[in-house]
């Protein structure tokens, strides 16, 4: 992929996460977006931030204790630490926090 294609894919991924959160219509989750960022907040105030890092062509995911950097590999965003796939990992974090299954795919 070219740099331009990667940047487009970065934006499309964030838009897709936003669309899927919006479609869930879950009272226990709230989210806000701004240019290159999706901020997800649970009922108890815990925040998860998914952000575009254009300079490094990465997506970063942060939660109160940890943070992960995701690189594009074979059309998927894979974390550089534990090889987590972005959507599955975000689903797992939110599901664990809320105590119920969350699906973003």
From Swiss-Prot:
This is Iron-sulfur cluster assembly protein CyaY. SMART domains: Frataxin_Cyay. InterPro entries: CyaY, Frataxin/CyaY, Frataxin/CyaY_sf. Keywords: Iron, Metal-binding. The gene is cyaY. HAMAP family: CyaY. Belongs to the frataxin family. Gene3D superfamilies: Frataxin/CyaY (3.30.920.10). NCBIfam families: FeS_CyaY. Involved in iron-sulfur (Fe-S) cluster assembly. May act as a regulator of Fe-S biogenesis. One of its GO terms (cellular component) is cytoplasm. SUPFAM superfamilies: Frataxin/Nqo15-like. One of its GO terms (biological process) is iron-sulfur cluster assembly. One of its GO terms (molecular function) is ferroxidase activity. PROSITE patterns: FRATAXIN_2.
């Amino acid at each position: 992929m070219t740099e331009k294609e990667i940047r487009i894919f970065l934006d499309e991924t964030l838009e897709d996460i936003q669309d899927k959160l919006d479609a869930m219509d879950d009272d226990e989750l709230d989210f806000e977006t701004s240019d290159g960022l999706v901020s997800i907040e649970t009922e108890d105030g815990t925040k998860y931030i998914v952000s575009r890092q254009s300079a490094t062509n990465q997506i970063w995911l942060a939660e109160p204790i940890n943070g992960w950097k995701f690189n594009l590999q074979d059309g998927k965003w894979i974390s550089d630490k534990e090889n987590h796939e972005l959507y599955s990992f975000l689903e797992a974090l939110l599901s664990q926090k809320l105590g119920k299954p969350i699906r973003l795919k």
